[in-house]
From Swiss-Prot:
Gene3D superfamilies reported in the protein's UniProt record: Rhodanese-like domain
Main location: cytoplasm
Protein name in UniProt: Thiosulfate sulfurtransferase GlpE
Active site location: 65
Keyword annotations: Cytoplasm, Transferase
Family, per entry: Belongs to the GlpE family.
Function: Transferase that catalyzes the transfer of sulfur from thiosulfate to thiophilic acceptors such as cyanide or dithiols. May function in a CysM-independent thiosulfate assimilation pathway by catalyzing the conversion of thiosulfate to sulfite, which can then be used for L-cysteine biosynthesis.
Lineage top rank: taxon: Bacteria
Source organism (scientific name): Salmonella arizonae (strain ATCC BAA-731 / CDC346-86 / RSK2980)
One BP annotation, GO: glycerol metabolic process
UniProt-listed InterPro entries: GlpE_sulfurtransferase, Rhodanese-like_dom, Rhodanese-like_dom_sf, Thiosulf_sulfurTrfase
Encoding gene, per UniProt annotation: glpE
Keyword hit for Cell membrane: no
PROSITE patterns: RHODANESE_3
Length: 108
């Protein structure tokens, strides 16, 4: 994959629950703590190294932000770091929360 792909929250939910991809949330710590997808890895500048050690480059990665805009830059960055398959989630956490209100966790 030379370019990241934009996917819907429904596609992301399906990939996540099939174990086909990992989910990273790039929002600020306060927003993440107030609500995030339960399986999301909170990806920040400080946690990037740990993420890259934990997940091989052949791991498919889905990037979630607030509304689906910032995730595009982060998805491109992960591709440049060597990840083979990267997806940006359209609508971000706002869409996730709207579609899957029961699938939201709180805390860091």
């Amino acid at each position: 994959m030379e370019q990241f792909e934009c996917i819907t929250v429904e596609e992301a939910y399906q990939k996540l629950h099939q174990g086909a991809a990992v989910l990273v949330d790039i929002r600020d710590p306060q927003s993440y703590a107030m609500g995030h997808a339960p399986q999301a890895f909170h990806l920040t500048n400080d946690t990037l190294g740990a993420f890259m050690r934990e997940y091989d480059f052949d791991t498919a990665v889905m990037v979630m932000c607030y509304h689906g805009n910032s995730s595009k830059g982060a998805a491109q960055y992960l591709l440049q770091q060597g990840y083979d398959a990267v997806y940006s989630i359209d609508g971000g956490f706002e869409a996730w929360h709207r579609h899957f209100p029961a699938d939201v966790a709180n805390g860091a």
